[in-house]
Regions:
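Short, flexible, glycine-rich and Lys/Arg-enriched loop motifs at helix boundaries
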Residues: 88-102, 163, 188-197, 218-226
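Conserved AMP-binding A3 loop
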Residues: 20, 27-54, 85
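Structural core segment of the AMP-binding/adenylate-forming
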Residues: 1-8, 109
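Conserved AMP-binding/adenylation subdomain of ANL enzymes
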Residues: 50-67, 72-114, 129
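Conserved pre-ATP/AMP-binding loop-to-beta segment of ANL
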Residues: 2, 10-31, 38, 61-67
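Gly/Ser/Thr-rich phosphate-binding loop
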Residues: 3, 84, 115-117, 128-197, ...
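Conserved ATP-binding/catalytic segment of the ANL
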Residues: 32, 226-282
Length: 282
């Protein structure tokens, strides 16, 4: 037991008084993956975490008492605020392709995991192992796939081994998370178009999040920037309670990726997209 007797014998109220902070006060510095350059420190304010926790609870039904297997350490930050237990599998987050499929599935089963977040590489390992071993994941409520495009056949296979859960594909980045999401059913409806090259299904914006498309440009956006016409492909830009406002001590990077539009601070996701006939982001 890592808790000493003094800690265990201390009245709960002594350690439960919250610290008074401003919603815009810095709460954490979370670094990007570095996949598009040197990792940048993203400033998470207390209001950012509040927005993210609310989004996870209200949109995905995550509840106190659940057990989460997360393959990316950053997502373990949310669980204590949700009353959720975090289980970390034996995996090197920088080398997910080397993870043991057997170990991953055993972790899900042995710890009675109800929710999980992983890349499509991990999702495929789990789905394939379950399929070959004729295994089921009856306690899973949801499985998030993110970090790379999730092929429809993978989404379908993973959903098929979950008796009572669903596969969810959220869209976002360290600087803005989550932004939108789609379900297994959404992917199946769009499957033909996805396989014909119409783009991955990213779903619709979460409540309170604004997604707009702007002309593709390598230059910073100024006050004169205007949205593109309906049906065109543009750069995905987002604003809302889950969107951060600056990088830590990197004014140049902040200037390049943030801009003000309609009285809100938007973040440039660096991805191209369009809205389909159902107004879902692709």
């Amino acid at each position: 037991n890592r808790f000493n007797e003094e800690t265990l014998s201390t009245p709960a109220e002594k350690n439960s008084n919250p610290v008074n902070v401003s919603p815009k006060e810095l709460a954490a510095i979370v670094f990007t993956s570095g996949s598009t350059g040197p990792p940048k420190g993203v400033c998470y304010m207390h209001k950012t975490f509040d927005g993210q926790i609310s989004a996870l609870r209200e949109n995905f039904g995550m509840q106190e008492g659940e057990v989460d297997m997360t393959t990316l350490p950053i997502f373990a930050l949310f669980n204590p605020a949700l009353g959720i237990t975090t289980v970390m599998p034996e995996i090197d987050p920088s080398k997910p392709a080397k993870a043991s499929a057997q170990s991953l599935v055993e972790t899900l089963v042995d710890f009675e995991v109800t929710t999980a977040f992983a890349s499509p590489v991990i999702g495929r390992k789990i789905a394939d192992w379950c399929e070959h071993g004729n295994l089921r994941l009856p306690r899973m409520n949801r499985f998030f796939l993110a970090g790379a495009p999730s092929p429809p056949q993978l989404v379908e296979k993973l959903a098929s081994v979950m008796d009572n859960g669903q596969v969810l594909i959220p869209y976002g980045a360290t600087e803005a998370l989550p932004v939108s999401y789609c379900t297994h059913a959404d992917v199946m409806r769009a499957r033909k178009g996805i396989e014909q090259g119409e783009g991955s299904c990213l779903g619709k914006a979460l409540p309170g999040v604004s997604i707009k498309l702007f002309p593709v440009s390598a230059s910073p956006f100024g006050n004169e920037v205007e949205e593109i016409n309906e049906g065109q492909v543009g750069e995905i830009c987002v604003a809302g309670p889950t969107v951060t406002e600056e990088y830590y001590r990197m004014p140049g990077a902040t200037f390049d990726s943030k801009f003000r539009y309609d009285s809100q601070i938007y973040h440039r996701m660096g991805d191209l997209g369009y809205f389909d006939v159902d107004l879902s982001l692709r």
